[in-house]
């Protein structure tokens, strides 16, 4: 998950309670103002005396009351990852996701909504990036009033999580970012967040040692002699 040191960030917690069932949903918003980053996650807490099941939970959701957007996603396969697909947001539902147990190279667990004239260097765009490598689901919906909704979270297919009384389900985090300076600036926002607030360890901001990739040259049958 995204972390911060000292006073780099603030967190807003909003607790929603269903008085009929005693179930609480806690919405957590983390703010990194210097990076134009907001993080969002959800906790589902069973405050009742009975066992419940969570069948669907989205970590982040945004509503756009007006605007005409394009949806940008990234698909791929072996040796051909991260291919950009840009399509108009149409009425109804457009969805990406994975049920492979991993997010995989088929679909990257992130989405961008961009204004029609947005390029690399100018224009408004919104990003959602899931800090999770398992099954996921991203969806964009446009209704009869031309309002757009953007959601990202755990894949709902085959998802059924039991919560005993007093237990809490912690949904993975989503990174949100916006800029009016084009896709390049949006990428920089996300890169800076990942580099400084997700990566850890000695080499987080230092030049890393050289890593020798022996796969194509020797596969798994390598020795000091074959590597030399």
Please describe what each predicted stretch is:
Residues 1-141, 157:
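Polysaccharide-binding surfaces and accessory modules of carbohydrate-active proteins
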Residues 189-228:
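An acidic-aromatic substrate-binding cleft motif
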